[in-house]
Every structure is written in structure tokens, then in C-alpha cells.
Amino acid sequence: MATKTKTKTKKKTARPIKVTPPTAAQADSLELLKQLSEAVAVSGDEGAVRKIVREAVTHLADEVSVDAMGNLFAIKHAASSRAPRVLVTAHLDEIGFMIVGEGKDGLHSFEAVGGIDDRILLGKPVWVGEDKIKGVIGFKPIHLVKPNERSTVVKIDSLKVDVGANRTVKAGDRATFATPFVDLGLAVRGKALDDRAGCAVLVEILRGKYPVELIAAFTVQEEVGLRGAKVAGYTAEPDAAIVIDCTPANDLPSQDDDVENSHYNTKLGHGPAIYSFDRGTVSDKRLIKHLASTAESKRIPYQHRQPGGGGTDAGAIHLTRSGVPSVSVSVPGRYLHSPAALMSKDDFYNTAKLVRAALESWSPKVLKR
């Protein structure tokens, strides 16, 4: 009787993902994004990021100025005085914290600035102020926590920022999560990619030449009520506006693929997300069409953001003066408003590519009714 011999099956080994080296321009954009991400610039105290952006745009624009609110404007004039005025914006500020009490032994009370989930605060390292004083959000270790407390979310008003005995921290100082920027190959990880990614994209847009009067506005205080955008939109008097921001990606590790999220549908690697409408804006249909047709003609991947929650500076800009046709384009990002967000490098590059192409092909037909 013949005996059967077992044949060993070879285990399949995963092929390494090929990462295309960035071009020189892309490498410059990533380096700028790193600087922007690692700066401390919480709403109302955007000076550190504004300084970086100003240095980056001074040689790219015909005019650079800062208004009383702190908005930074960089203007590229068109050849014709009759050219349409197009406002393109990204916000400088990030969510974070404000020190509100000068405590003893380096322990300071603090409040959230912008939308932050209390669940993610415990034990997180922070940077305080432009000097990035190192601290940590203190909490009771598990040894001291009662069993019935372990399933309870600790509220922010019972936490402290601990900076040791450093006396240079004072009430009013801003703080952010202490997250270094990291290149992950196909993606990047960092804090405040909402909306430092948009700021880096807008700097890249300023490198182009367009048949429009381009008004680039780097706005302040978006995370606390679109306050800078209200002023910027009024000052610019644009014929149209494009807002560049970040939107929550829904392709999360904990998300059931079979469940449709009622507010967000974007995915990393699928291109910039064009808004139809959100909580604050119904995007102008003509601008949606122009962006989508531009993407298709230039073979730039894009996605339509599912109508629903959230909002951008467009919510304030479209209501200024007699009204401004507006649309938002966002870079999708995972884990926004947390210590570390994740963003596809291709989505980042393609957002700049799409808006540049849309501006280059601008004509009177874009806003024709």
C-alpha cells in the first residue's frame, strides 16, 4: 500500500509596498508641513504658525499683510484688472488647551480650546507656549483608582497640566499635544494636520500662475467659531471662495465596513474630498462641477464628501457682504482632533494639484448661471 507524503505548503510572504520617492517640490511641502504641525498655535495665539507661513509666502506673492484679527493675506495679482477675485483659505489655528490657573508644584488647571474628547486626555504629553515647555496631563494611576471609577470618563475640569516646578507657565498660555511629525512612507502622522495640511497646500497653490486675482488667506480662530474667516471674507470681497481644510476619514480600524456613517464617508488614498454641504454651508453647485470636471480631465483622484456634519470657514465666508459662492475641498484624515492624526501623502499632494488646476482653468463660464 502506497503511503501518502505530505507536501509542505510555502507561506506567502507579503511583498513590501513600493513607496515612490517624493519630487523636490513634494519634499519641500512635507518639510513645511512638519514645521507647521510641530508648532504650538492654538486658537487665538497663532503667531508661531503665522511666522512660518509668512516666511514661506513672502517671495511667492505680490502683497503680504496681516490684519487686526491676525489673518495673513498673500495676494497674487492678475494681468487684467477685470479678472475675477478668488479667495482661497486655510486656517492657521489648532485645537488645544489654555492654562487657566497657576497652581502649586507645577500643577495647572486648564480648559479645552475647540472640540476635544475628554476620553483621550489622560497621561498625554503636552507642549506649553511657543517655547514648547514640556508637561503632561496628570491623572490617577490604576493603583489609586477605585473599581467603580475605571469605567468613568474623567472630566477635563478635574485634570491638571503638570510641568514640574517650571514657573514660566502662566494663566492664558496655550498648550497642545506633544506629538512629533513622522513620515510613515505612504502616510504621515502628526498633530494639528487639521488644518496645517491645508496651510501647506495653500502655500503650494501660491507657486502657480492664474488668470484670476488670487487672494490666499490663512485665517485664525476657525476652531472656535470661524471668527477670522468672517473678517477675511469681508475684507477680500471675492467673487468666489475655495476653502481648504481636513475632514474625518471613515475608514477606521474600529469601523464596521457594512455600516454607513451618517456624516462622514471619505477614505484615505481616494483623493481630496469635495463638499456638497455640511452643517454651515451649501456649496455652490457651479464650483462643485468645476472642481469635479477639472479632476476628471486631469485624472486627479477625488471623492465627494457625504453631506452631513462638521463645517469649515466657508460657513462664514459665503454669508459676507452680498454673498460669496463657496466650496470646500478637504484632505481626509484619520483621528482628527486627537494627539495624532494620519493623512495620505497622495491625498495631500492631489489636493494642491486639484485646486491649482481649477484655478488655472478658471473662466467666466465657471460662475455662469
Where are these regions (language model features)?
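N-terminal hydrophobic/helix-forming segments and targeting peptides
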Residues: 1-369
